[in-house]
Regions:
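A structural signal for isolated positions on well-ordered beta-strands in alpha/beta enzyme cores
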Residues: 97-99
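Alpha-helical transmembrane segments that form the membrane-embedded catalytic/substrate-binding core
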Residues: 74-78
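Short, solvent-exposed loop/turn segments at secondary-structure boundaries
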Residues: 66-70, 142-145
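Soluble metallo-hydrolase cores and metallopeptidase-like ectodomains found primarily
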Residues: 1-69, 79-95, 117
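"Short basic amphipathic alpha-helical interaction patches in structured regions
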Residues: 71-72, 113
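Glycine-/small-residue-rich active-site loops that bind phosphorylated ligands and cofactors
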Residues: 63, 70, 103-107
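Metal-dependent peptidase/peptidase-like ectodomains
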Residues: 1-12, 17, 49-50, 101-173
C-alpha cells in the first residue's frame, strides 16, 4: 500500500527528518465500490467495408504528479494517430478503434476489462491487433520495453533495431 501526501506536507516531513528521527502516524480511507464512469471510445471505419479493426488503447486515469507522462502523452499520441487515420479512412483496409480506459491505475484494469466483456463477440470475430502506449516521451529514457506474444518477438526486435538505432530495448510478455 502507499499513501500520497501534498508537496507542502512532504517538504515539512523532509525538514523534520533532517533534524532527527521522526515518528509519523498516517491513516487513509479507501472506498472500493462500483460506480458509473464514462469511457471514451472512438472508431474510424475501414474504407473497404471490412469489419476487421485494430485497437489502440491507453488509460485516462493517473496517479497525482505523473499525469503528463502517465498517460497524457500516450493519449496525445492516440489522438494524433486517430486524426491521421481518419484523414485516410477511405484507404484503410481495416478499421481502427481507439479506447481511453478508466480504472487502470487502481490495479483492476476495470475499464479495458469492461470493454472486452461488453464487446467480446465483436473482438473475437474482428479484432486483429492491439497496441497500448503507456508512458511515452520520458526525457532521458535509455531503456525501451516492448511486450507481446512470442510470435512477434523477431518482428519487434527488427523494428526496435531500425527505430532505436542501437538503444537497448527489453522485450517481455
Amino acid at each position: 500500500p502507499c499513501l500520497g501526501l501534498s508537496r507542502a506536507d512532504g517538504l515539512e516531513l523532509r525538514a523534520m527528518v533532517a533534524r532527527g528521527p521522526v515518528r509519523v502516524r498516517m491513516s487513509a480511507e479507501c472506498r472500493d465500490e462500483w460506480r458509473p464512469l464514462r469511457q471514451a471510445v472512438g472508431r474510424v471505419p475501414s474504407g473497404t467495408g471490412s469489419l476487421e479493426f485494430a485497437i489502440l488503447g491507453g488509460h485516462m486515469d493517473s496517479w497525482f504528479g505523473q499525469a503528463a507522462s502517465d498517460n497524457a502523452a500516450g493519449n496525445a499520441i492516440f489522438l494524433e494517430l486517430a486524426r491521421v487515420f481518419q484523414r485516410h479512412a477511405p484507404e484503410l483496409r481495416r478499421g481502427l478503434t481507439v479506447g481511453f480506459w478508466v480504472g487502470h491505475e487502481t490495479g483492476t484494469m476495470i475499464g479495458s476489462s469492461h470493454f472486452v466483456d461488453r464487446f467480446w463477440d465483436d473482438l473475437r470475430e474482428n479484432a486483429v491487433a492491439y497496441l497500448q502506449i503507456d508512458q511515452p516521451a520520458l526525457v532521458g529514457t535509455t531503456l525501451w520495453e516492448t511486450k507481446s506474444d512470442v510470435e512477434l518477438h523477431d518482428f519487434h526486435a527488427a523494428v526496435e533495431r531500425r527505430v532505436l538505432g542501437g538503444i537497448s530495448a527489453y522485450w517481455g510478455r
